[in-house]
């Protein structure tokens, strides 16, 4: 195939490449996908960033550790970071979590006892409803606290240029007039944003 728009990316490379906030990751071979589904240690070493519902972002790991130390939280509890206080209320009410310490942060935090089925249920619930704290908000917090040295700066295309490029490409791919292409948000919007 000549003039292909597809390139080979090594397993674990973020898509878009070199973007700490990427929501997709390269798994170029069928074996990579099988290893990921089976959660082999080798693949988990390679894939440190992926779709946030499936892989905890490195910034969230750093932030959870910081919150645990800042509030002197017992090791019997897992710090679970959420997108908002509204998310805290929803998760707390559903799973009867009523933290005994006051945590005052610009995002949601709950403490769930380690080694319990409740922790797994809470994490699954958060995964499916999308209550995860964003890596960009975590980055801002970590930078302000001096826990990371730099912030990843993302380049953005002009909105009209991006829209025209996408609709034109889709129109050609589907052999349709560009006016027939309509972009709408969906669960897969992260994939087309990555490409």
Which residues does each PLM region occupy?
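Conserved N-terminal alpha-helix of the aminotransferase class I/II PLP-enzyme fold
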Residues: 1-189
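Buried hydrophobic packing segments
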Residues: 190-195
């Amino acid at each position: 195939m000549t003039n292909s728009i597809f390139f080979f990316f090594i397993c674990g490379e973020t898509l878009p490449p070199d973007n700490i906030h990427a929501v997709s990751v390269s798994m170029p071979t069928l074996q990579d996908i099988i290893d990921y589904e089976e959660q082999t240690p080798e693949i988990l070493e390679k894939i440190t960033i992926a779709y946030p519902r499936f892989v905890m972002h490195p910034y969230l790991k750093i932030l959870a550790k910081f919150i645990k130390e800042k509030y002197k939280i017992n090791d019997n509890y897992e710090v679970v970071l959420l997108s908002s206080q509204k998310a805290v209320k929803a998760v707390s009410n559903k799973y009867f979590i009523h933290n005994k310490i006051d945590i005052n942060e610009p995002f949601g935090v709950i403490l769930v006892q380690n080694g319990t089925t409740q922790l797994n249920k809470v994490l699954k619930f958060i995964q499916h409803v999308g209550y995860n704290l964003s890596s960009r908000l975590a980055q801002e917090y970590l930078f302000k606290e001096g826990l990371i040295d730099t912030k990843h700066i993302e380049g953005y295309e002009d909105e009209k240029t991006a829209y025209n490029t996408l609709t034109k490409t889709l129109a050609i791919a589907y052999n349709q007039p560009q006016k027939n292409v309509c972009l709408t948000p969906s669960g897969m919007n992260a994939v087309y944003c990555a490409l």
